[in-house]
C-alpha cells in the first residue's frame, strides 16, 4: 500500500503507539469529507495530503488540517509549535481534524491514501480504528462523482483509502439490504449450514469458466456421486460467455450476486479458486458485512499461472493482503519459490499440477499456423483514460509490432496468422490496437476458450504472462518481449532472473523480436533444445491427473 512513498513512510507495525494516527470518526457531506483522528503524542505536522497509488501517474492533493490537544478548547490551524511542557511529556494525546473537498480535485480511478507528513521527515498513514471500520459496513459514506463512485475503505493494515471506480449495479441500496438480510438469515441458521460442508468454486471476477476453477468443478460434477457433489457450487455471472454451456450443471451453478451466492459465500467450508477471495464477490465493493466474512474463510488457491515471473508475495503471502490457506503448485521448483518467499509451511503448498492442464494437448496444425500474442496487464495502466492508454509505451510498442510492414509481408508469404489477445482488464482499449494488417486478428480474453487458443497456436509471444507456462508445457516455443523490463521490475519484480533463466528467447526491442519470429517460422516453430530440457524441472506431472490429486488433497484436509 502507498506504493512509491519510499522508505520514509512508516508502516502500521513500524510506528510506535505514539506515532500511529488513528481515525475515530468519518463524516461525508456532498463532495466534502472530514476525518477526525487521534495521535498518541504531539506531532509537528508539515502537511496532510491525499495521494494516488498509481506509480506512473503520481499525484497528491493538499488537505486542510487542525490540531486540538485533548482537554483544551483551542483549535490550532496549520503548522503549530507545541509548548516545551507538552513536548517534554510526550504523552498528551492530540486530536487531528483533516478535511478536503473532492470537488476541487481531479481524481481518477484507483486508490487514494491519506497521509500526514511531519517536520521530522516521516510520512504517516492514517489508520481506521475498529469502531469506524464497523460503521463503514452499515453507513452510507459514498461521495457522489457522476457515473463514478468514491468511498472510504480500510485497505492494507486498516489504512484509510478513498477508492474511485465506475458505478456498478451492485452499488444499489437494494443490494445492501439483500446483503444484510442474507447475513442475518445465515447467522440464525448457521449450525444447519455448517453441517453441509459446502465448497464454493470460482474464477476471475466470477465472469469466466475456463481456468483451473472450472476444470476442477467439472471434474467433481462428472466423477463424484450425487451425495458428494450436491454441495459443490460454481459461481458465475449470467452475462458470462460461458454461462450457456455451464447451465447443464443445474443448481450447482450459482448466479453471481444472487441470494444463494451470498449465502454460500458465508456458509462455505472452503473456497477453491484460481484467484483471490475478493474475486468471489462484487469487485471493489463498498464496505459490507459479507466481504468482511469472506476474508476469514479457508481457501485452496489453484492459481491462475505458475508463480515465478511476477512477485505476488505481498498479495498472496501468509502475511500478505490476500493470504491463502493452501497454495497449489506444479513442481518442486515452484514449491521452493513459494515456501521461501511467501511464508507457508511445505505441507500447505502441495504439488498438485494445474487442473486445466488435464485437458491440454497439442492441436497446432501445419496448414493453420498462428502466433498467439498475449501480453499481460500493467497495473499502472489499469483504470486509466483512453487518452492515457493510447499514449503509453505499452500501446505504442504493440501497435508498431502489429503494423510492422516487414513482419506483415513475411506472415503473408508464409501463411501465418497473428492472434492478438488482450487482457480482460484492458478490454475497453481493444480499439486502440485496430490495424489494417489482414494477418492480425484481435480478441478479448473470454470471447474464445483460452485453452483452445493455447492448444492450437504454433508459438506464443508474451512479456511476463504466466500463460507462457501452458505453452511451455505443450513443448511449443515462447518469445518474451520485455521492452519495459526495468519498469516492470520496479512495479512487480520476479522470482527468477529473467535475463538468463527464461524458457524462451528474450527481446527488448522490435528488431530483435521480428528477427526471432522469422527464424521460428523458417524452422517450422521447433522448440530449441535448451528450453525443452528445462521442462523436467518445471513440471512434476504430465499425467492428466491433476484434478484427481486436487480432490484427494481437499479430502485429506477434512474439507
Per-region residue spans from a language model:
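Basic, ligand-binding patches in group-transfer machinery
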Residues: 1-198
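Active-site and donor-binding regions of nucleotide-sugar-utilizing enzymes
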Residues: 35-38, 65, 198-360
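Conserved catalytic-core segment of nucleotide-activated headgroup transferases in glycan assembly
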Residues: 210-217, 355-432, 507, 539-542, ...
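Short acidic-hydrophobic, aromatic-tinged amphipathic segments that line or gate anion-handling sites
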Residues: 252-259, 441-446, 502-516
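Donor nucleotide-activated moiety binding/catalytic core segment of transferases
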Residues: 254-264, 424-469
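A donor-sugar binding/catalytic signature common to diverse glycosyltransferases
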Residues: 278, 283, 301, 447-492
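Catalytic binding pocket for nucleotide-activated donors in carbohydrate/polymer assembly enzymes
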Residues: 346, 432-437, 466-541
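C-terminal alpha-helical cap of glycosyltransferases
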Residues: 543-559
Amino acid at each position: 500500500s502507498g506504493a512509491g512513498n519510499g522508505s520514509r513512510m512508516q508502516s502500521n507495525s513500524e510506528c510506535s503507539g505514539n506515532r500511529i494516527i488513528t481515525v475515530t470518526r468519518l463524516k461525508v457531506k456532498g463532495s466534502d469529507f472530514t476525518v477526525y483522528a487521534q495521535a498518541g503524542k504531539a506531532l509537528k505536522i508539515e502537511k496532510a495530503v491525499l495521494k494516488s497509488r498509481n506509480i506512473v501517474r503520481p499525484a497528491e492533493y493538499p488537505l486542510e488540517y487542525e490540531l486540538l490537544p485533548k482537554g483544551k478548547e483551542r483549535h490550532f490551524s496549520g503548522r503549530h509549535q507545541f509548548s516545551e511542557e507538552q513536548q517534554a511529556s510526550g504523552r498528551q494525546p492530540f486530536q487531528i481534524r483533516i478535511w478536503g473537498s473532492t470537488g476541487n480535485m481531479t481524481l481518477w480511478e484507483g486508490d487514494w491514501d491519506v497521509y500526514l507528513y511531519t517536520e521530522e521527515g516521516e510520512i504517516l498513514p492514517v489508520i481506521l480504528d475498529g469502531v469506524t471500520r464497523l460503521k463503514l459496513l452499515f453507513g452510507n459514506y459514498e461521495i457522489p462523482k457522476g457515473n463514478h463512485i468514491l468511498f472510504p475503505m480500510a485497505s492494507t493494515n486498516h489504512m484509510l483509502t478513498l477508492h474511485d471506480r465506475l458505478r456498478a449495479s451492485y452499488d444499489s441500496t437494494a443490494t445492501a439490504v439483500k446483503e444484510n438480510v442474507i447475513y442475518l438469515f445465515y447467522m440464525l441458521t448457521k449450525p444447519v449450514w455448517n453441517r453441509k460442508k459446502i465448497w464454493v468454486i470460482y474464477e476471475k471476477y466470477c465472469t469466466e469458466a475456463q481456468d483451473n476453477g472450472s476444470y476442477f468443478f467439472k471434474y467433481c460434477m462428472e466423477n463424484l456421486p450425487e451425495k458428494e457433489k450436491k454441495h459443490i457450487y460454481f459461481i458465475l455471472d449470467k452475462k458470462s460467455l460461458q454461462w450457456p454451456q455451464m447451465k447443464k450443471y443445474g443448481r450447482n451453478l450459482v448466479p453471481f450476486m444472487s441470494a444463494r451466492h451470498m449465502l454460500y459465500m458465508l456458509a462455505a467450508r472452503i473456497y477453491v479458486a484460481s484467484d483471490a477471495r475478493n474475486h468471489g464477490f462484487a469487485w471493489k465493493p463498498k464496505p459490507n458485512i459479507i466481504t468482511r466474512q469472506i476474508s476469514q474463510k479457508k481457501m485452496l488457491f489453484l492459481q491462475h499461472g505458475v508463480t515465478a515471473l511476477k512477485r505476488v508475495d505481498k498479495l498472496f503471502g501468509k502475511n500478505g493482503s490476500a493470504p491463502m490457506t493452501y497454495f497449489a503448485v506444479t513442481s518442486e521448483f515452484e514449491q521452493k519459490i513459494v515456501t521461501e518467499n511467501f511464508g507457508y509451511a511445505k505441507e500447505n503448498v502441495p504439488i498438485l499440477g494445474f487442473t486445466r492442464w488435464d485437458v491440454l494437448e497439442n492441436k497446432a496444425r501445419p496448414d493453420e499456423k498462428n502466433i498467439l500474442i498475449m501480453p499481460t496487464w500493467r497495473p499502472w495502466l489499469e483504470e486509466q483514460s483512453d487518452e492515457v492508454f493510447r499514449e503509453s509505451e505499452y500501446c505504442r510498442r504493440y501497435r508498431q509490432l502489429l503494423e510492422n510492414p516487414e513482419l506483415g509481408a513475411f506472415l503473408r508469404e508464409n501463411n501465418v496468422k497473428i492472434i492478438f489477445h488482450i487482457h480482460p482488464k484492458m478490454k475497453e482499449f481493444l480499439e486502440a490496437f485496430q490495424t489494417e494488417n489482414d494477418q492480425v486478428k484481435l480478441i478479448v480474453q473470454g470471447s474464445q476458450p483460452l485453452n483452445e487458443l493455447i492448444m492450437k497456436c504454433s508459438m506464443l509471444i508474451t512479456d511476463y504472462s504466466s500463460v507462457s507456462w501452458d505453452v511451455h508445457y505443450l513443448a511449443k516455443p515462447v518469445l518474451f518481449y520485455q521492452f519495459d523490463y526495468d519498469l516492470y521490475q520496479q512495479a512487480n519484480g520476479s522470482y527468477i532472473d529473467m535475463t538468463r533463466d527464461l524458457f524462451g528467447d528474450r527481446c527488448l526491442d522490435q528488431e530483435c523480436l521480428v528477427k526471432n519470429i522469422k527464424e521460428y517460422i523458417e524452422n517450422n516453430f521447433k522448440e530449441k533444445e535448451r528450453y525443452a530440457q528445462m521442462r523436467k524441472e518445471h513440471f512434476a506431472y504430465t499425467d492428466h491427473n491433476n484434478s484427481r490429486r486436487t480432490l484427494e488433497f481437499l479430502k485429506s484436509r477434512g474439507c
